[in-house]
Amino acid sequence: MFLAQEIIRKKRNGDVLSTAEIQFFVDGITHNTVSEGQIAAFGMAVYFKDMNMDERIALTIAMRDSGTVLNWDSLGLNGPIIDKHSTGGVGDVISLMLGPMAAACGGYVPMISGRGLGHTGGTLDKFDAIPGYQTEPSSELFRKVVKDAGVAIIGQTGDLVPADKRFYSIRDNTATVESISLITASILSKKLAAGLDALAMDVKVGSGAFMPTYEASEELARSITAVANGAGTKTTALLTDMNQVLASCAGNAVEVREAINFLTGQYRNPRLYAVTMGLCAEMLILGGIAQNEAEARHKLNTVLDNGKAAEAFAKMVSGLGGPTDFVEAYDKYLPHAKIVRPVYANTSGFAYKMDTRELGLAVVTLGGGRRKPGDALDYSVGLTQVCALGQEVNKDVPLAMIHAQSEDAFAEAAAAIQQAIIIGDSAPEKTPEIYRYIRASDL
């Protein structure tokens, strides 16, 4: 038997906690036998004194096991359970293509996603734009769709990782969100509760990223790779660029349109294609579906070209209650904004630098994101045809198309976009879409 205050004291003094002590404290979070004040103090102690990798692994496993851990054995699936997680960005629509692509290659993707908060969009919010789609299905329906379609993208259910829900809400109110140890455990406990064999982690870098610097993003990527592999799930992290909007758009319905155009081959934004392929290929390799990068890419391009990936998306949407002809007739079902109009730069030149975070906040201002949890969203609003860094803009080539519901909202977003995209006399140096891979062998 331990005392919560002694565990807090030990960590406050910079000592290493045992697995049993961490397990005891997490049990206390789950069952309300440690107080909010004690949880806040523990979070602050970890924030200042940190945890070593063994402590992080113990915390992740204890939080993962605080609720239901999904088990897929009874379904007799003939492929690996694989998934991807992103630290969040703007125009990051990857999940909508990657899940169906991996499924069409023989993987099973039970993706438990979140809603947007702050400047980043949430995968679940995009699916809420699809009429009838159930983001919170019963566990029976979730399992059925994973088996039949190979992929199901849903929200976190109440019985998964209850310790994280309580701990995170307290961290949010006590300025301890930014601890690498606690971020690692929070992300991975939720992901690993899905019963995964393998995980590809997308850690964003740049002006639209969650972590403020490249160094901090790399530290988080290393921590996640080490802890996930230590907890028994094969994991690779990719450091990817978020110094500009990833897709050609940002919002909810507008991103669903771009995802379908990508899957059906109507249009594939080259940066979006590069990052999606990098992550998805890594999932196939970790899951044993492909032996190497070349084989993985060949398989992925095949399912994009033969329509199997689009078919998996369609099966998932109809299986979770959406329209059966959604891929063919998506525009009939998705909401449209009243005003769709371009915003131009004040001078001609090249898109030189972007404050991607501010562009994400412009979508929030339009009504496409949340200022606080629980806010209702307008799924029709957002940005499309967002210029890429290095692109020439002038009186004929806009910075973006704004989808707004009122003239006031349009004007506010237009001013924010003009301020967020800096115009230069020449194109900036090109940055890579993927900076590096961090695999278990690199640690």
Curated annotation (Swiss-Prot):
The UniProt entry's GO biological process terms, in alphabetical order, are: pyrimidine nucleobase metabolic process; thymidine metabolic process
The Swiss-Prot or TrEMBL record describes its family as follows:
Belongs to the thymidine/pyrimidine-nucleoside phosphorylase family.
Give the protein's biological function.
Answer: The enzymes which catalyze the reversible phosphorolysis of pyrimidine nucleosides are involved in the degradation of these compounds and in their utilization as carbon and energy sources, or in the rescue of pyrimidine bases for nucleotide synthesis.
Indicate what this protein is called per its UniProt record.
Answer: Thymidine phosphorylase
Q: Which PROSITE patterns match?
A: THYMID_PHOSPHORYLASE (PS00647)
- Keywords carried by this UniProt record: Glycosyltransferase, Transferase
Known EC number: 2.4.2.4
Q: Per its UniProt record, what SUPFAM superfamilies does this chain match? A: Nucleoside phosphorylase/phosphoribosyltransferase catalytic domain, Nucleoside phosphorylase/phosphoribosyltransferase N-terminal domain, Pyrimidine nucleoside phosphorylase C-terminal domain
For this protein, the record's PANTHER family field holds: THYMIDINE PHOSPHORYLASE
- Asked whether the keyword Transferase is assigned, the reply is yes
List the InterPro entries hit by this protein, alphabetically: Glycosyl_Trfase_fam3 (IPR000312), Glycosyl_Trfase_fam3_N_dom (IPR017459), Glycosyl_Trfase_fam3_N_dom_sf (IPR036320), Nuc_phospho_transferase (IPR035902), PYNP-like_C_sf (IPR036566), PYNP_C (IPR013102), Pyrmidine_PPas_bac/euk (IPR018090), Pyrmidine_PPase_CS (IPR017872)
